Amino acid sequence: MVTIRLARGGSKKRPFYHLTVTDSRNSRDGRFIERVGFFNPIARGQEERLRVNRERVDFWLGQGAQASERVAQLLKAAQ
């Protein structure tokens, strides 16, 4: 099954997440089909906290991809 989920990046104690479209059998930070945005949970000041390519997310959801719980919350907040 294709899922839209977060892949962790950044460094120790400074998480940064990419919103990725991937096969659910792949590891969290492993192979992916497409990156459709990012989430920076510790953004400060003018730094961008969330960016989502809504057009591509809607395309993948239309193709039957499932969003993870956290990604679904982020997509709702991005509207």
From Swiss-Prot:
- Which SUPFAM superfamilies does this UniProt record tie to the protein? Ribosomal protein S16 (SSF54565)
Q: Which UniProt keywords apply?
A: Ribonucleoprotein, Ribosomal protein
| Name of this chain's protein | Small ribosomal subunit protein bS16
Q: Does the keyword Oxidoreductase apply?
A: no
Upper lineage is:
Bacteria, Pseudomonadati, Pseudomonadota, Gammaproteobacteria, Pseudomonadales
Q: Per the record, what is one GO cellular component? A: small ribosomal subunit
Q: Which family does it belong to?
A: Belongs to the bacterial ribosomal protein bS16 family.
Q: Which Gene3D superfamilies match?
A: 3.30.1320.10
* A Pfam family hit: Ribosomal_S16
Highest taxon listed in the record's lineage: Bacteria
Q: Which GO terms describe its biological process?
A: translation
Which PANTHER family does the UniProt record give?
Answer: 30S RIBOSOMAL PROTEIN S16, SMALL RIBOSOMAL SUBUNIT PROTEIN BS16M
Per its UniProt record, what InterPro entries does this chain match? Answer: Ribosomal_bS16 (IPR000307), Ribosomal_bS16_dom_sf (IPR023803)
